[in-house]
Structures are given as C-alpha cells and as structure tokens.
C-alpha cells in the first residue's frame, strides 16, 4: 500500500531558515490539520474497518465512481444500512448517472476541458488556450461539495434521516460559466471572448 500519490511529489524548500527536508506542498496545503489512515479496500478487513468508522460518523465523503463504490460496499445503500443518519457525499468527474458516469475525471479534463471553459477563455478566433492554474477546478468544486454536505448535515440532524449528496467537476464548471452558456443557448451569442484590444475595458 502506498496511499495518496500526491504524497510523493516533494521538493526541497529554497528558504534559508527551513530545515533540510522535502516538502510535499500540494499535499500539505490541501490536507493540513487532518489525520490520515491507510486502508486496503481489496480486503474484507479493510472494508470492515470503513464500516466500523461509519457507525459513529456523521459524514462519509468519497470520490470513487459509482460502480467502485458498490464493489467495495461503500455506496449509499450499504452505508445507510449501517448508519441510517449518515450523510453520504460523492464527488466525481461527471456525476453518478448519465452517459459519462463511468468516466474518471480530473481538474484539467472534466472541469476545464469538457465543460468548455478552456475554449471560452481563449481570446478571439485565433486565441491561445491559457494554462489552467493547478487544482483551481478541484478547489472550486470542493467549495460546492462542502456547501452541499453542510446543508445535508443540517437536514439529517433535523429529520433524523440520512442524506445523499453529490457534485462533480463538470457540473461545477458549467455553473461557473452559466451566464455565457445561457447567452449561447438563448441568443446564439459566441461563448468565446473577443480579444482584449477589441474591448472597451481590457480587464
């Protein structure tokens, strides 16, 4: 078992007063203040450990595709049977149903690429696609995910019944660009922006 692959992207700091050790800044930034355990989901013991933790948990967050959740008994039905008040939250690339539900998704593919954001950010007909900032789509989708979880947690506390929420990189990206997409659908206006020198305000 190796755990999260992001742990392995390390480098030495350039600050003189820092100790001579490797920093995995991407993992540290996103996981500061958290405690981690490594679980083998290929074993019954590992799945049993997750089920044991879920008995007293309020929230279960998962980024596995729906078919893999079922394979490892981590789907909504399996976990709500263990803890009927649990909030089961799923974040995927393209959602849990529809023709793309089986497809893995990443920040640059599902959020920026398939949503059309890359193309929409080009300037003019011959514009260059800008580089996406690292994890910008991941972090934006994480905010939507946390808002859904908090709302579901509140409802679970009030009703005494477990809740299921989900979001995806693709759906969140579409929402961030909804004004341009709406304009395209209703007025047939181009989604792509004009070049900066053609605008009254280059900002």
Where are these regions (language model features)?
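Acidic, glycine-rich segments within the central catalytic cores of soluble metabolic enzymes
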Residues: 14-18, 97, 109, 113-203
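Alpha-helical scaffold segments in soluble metabolic enzymes
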Residues: 8, 52, 148-152
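N-terminal Rossmann-like NAD(P) cofactor-binding subdomain of oxidoreductases
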Residues: 43, 60-121
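A structured beta-alpha segment of the ubiquitous adenosine-cofactor-binding alpha/beta core
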Residues: 19-81
């Amino acid at each position: 078992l190796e755990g999260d692959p992001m742990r392995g992207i390390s480098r030495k700091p350039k600050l003189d007063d820092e100790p001579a050790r490797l920093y995995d800044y991407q993992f540290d930034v996103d996981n500061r203040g958290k405690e981690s355990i490594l679980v083998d989901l290929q074993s019954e013991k590992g799945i049993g450990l997750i089920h044991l933790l879920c008995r007293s948990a309020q929230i279960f967050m998962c980024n596995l595709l729906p078919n893999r959740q079922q394979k490892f008994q981590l789907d909504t039905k399996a976990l709500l049977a263990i803890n009927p008040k649990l909030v089961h939250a799923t974040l995927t690339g393209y959602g849990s149903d529809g023709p793309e539900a089986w497809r893995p998704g990443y920040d640059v593919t599902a959020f920026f690429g398939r949503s059309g954001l890359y193309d929409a950010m080009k300037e003019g007909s011959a514009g260059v696609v800008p580089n996406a900032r690292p994890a910008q789509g991941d972090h934006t989708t994480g905010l939507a995910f946390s808002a859904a979880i908090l709302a579901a947690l509140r409802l679970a506390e009030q009703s005494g019944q477990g809740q299921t929420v989900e979001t995806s990189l693709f759906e969140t990206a579409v929402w961030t660009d909804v004004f341009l997409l709406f304009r395209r659908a209703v007025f047939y206006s181009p989604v792509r922006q004009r070049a900066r020198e053609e605008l009254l305000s280059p900002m």
